[in-house]
Amino acid sequence: ITQHTVRQTSSIETYYEEEEYLYTYPDGTTEIRTREVERRRLHISLRASSPDEVMSSIGFTEEQRQWASYIHDNIADNQTQGDSPAVDMGDVTFTDAEIPVVYYAQTDGRWSGISYSGSTIGIAGCGPTSVAIAASTLTGQVITPPEVAAWSEATGHATYGNGSYHSLIPDALAHYGLTVQRAGASSAQQLVDALSSGKLVVVIMGPGTFTTSGHFIVLRGVTVDGKVLIADPYSYSFSQREWDLPLIMREAKRSAGSGGPFWIVSS
């Protein structure tokens, strides 16, 4: 857990000091006198406490600490980067890789405002949208982001206010009859081999190019010169670019749960 809590403390100091003032006599003459005046000074102190310090002050047990870390590391945050077209994308299929890939945008006006995980698909729906991309592509059926989002909430894979648990990816894809193979964060050649053979790879990205916290995307192919093609449910423009594999490997969320950060998907 990397976020910090800022605590504020304050105190008031009372002190006295002399000040000069002009005294006027009844006859109109004046003289400068001194008097003692009470003053007060406010002291404010700000201190950033680490999560460990906060949990210690609350009295967390070791088990509670581990559970808090688990919750933090096993949710997909919704801080995405890139463009966000809140319009009807229509029917989009990428045909520049080993297999045609159906593309859905979570910000598509047809469903971006639909409620999901205490938010909306447009804001928090990268997980269901990535599943919809992979499932529609590999099954040949029309499986939309709202359908996957409804399944996610009904089966406890949505975490309120934080998008989706990482377990959504393997569980939802298996629900649609697909085979899911978990791959670790250092499996570059395994990913290239999978993409070259027409498989898809869902990945949870960490802070960097695609997100400030966590974001699901789909790797959909590899070019002859080793560049990776993606389907980013939040950014159509990112989905049209070629990406360096080392960047993908470096920014994949290494703390991912449920066998991530990479899930190789095949029919």
Residue spans of the language-model regions?
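Active-site-adjacent structural segments surrounding the nucleophilic cysteine of cysteine proteases
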Residues: 1-2, 26-28, 43-158
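Serine/threonine-rich low-complexity intrinsically disordered regions
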Residues: 2-48
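Noncatalytic regulatory segments and standalone regulatory/sensor domains
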Residues: 53, 59, 66, 70-73, ...
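Extracytoplasmic/secreted cell-surface and envelope-processing proteins
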Residues: 160-169, 210-215, 238-240
